[in-house]
């Protein structure tokens, strides 16, 4: 589970 990856994905989707 890549936490930073998820955060970056959410940040990129915003």
Curated annotation (Swiss-Prot):
The keyword 4Fe-4S does not apply. Expressed by the venom gland. Keywords: Amidation, Antibiotic, Antimicrobial, Cytolysis, Fungicide, G-protein coupled receptor impairing toxin, Immunity, Innate immunity, Mast cell degranulation, Membrane, Secreted, Target cell membrane, Target membrane, Toxin. It comes from the Eukaryota. GO terms for biological process: defense response to bacterium; defense response to fungus; innate immune response; killing of cells of another organism. The modification Leucine amide is found at residue 14. One of its GO terms (molecular function) is toxin activity. It is found in: Secreted; Target cell membrane. This is Eumenine mastoparan-EF. The keyword Membrane applies. GO terms for cellular component: extracellular region; membrane; other organism cell membrane. It comes from Eumenes fraterculus (Solitary wasp).
């Amino acid at each position: 589970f890549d936490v930073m990856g998820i955060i970056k994905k959410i940040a990129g989707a915003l």
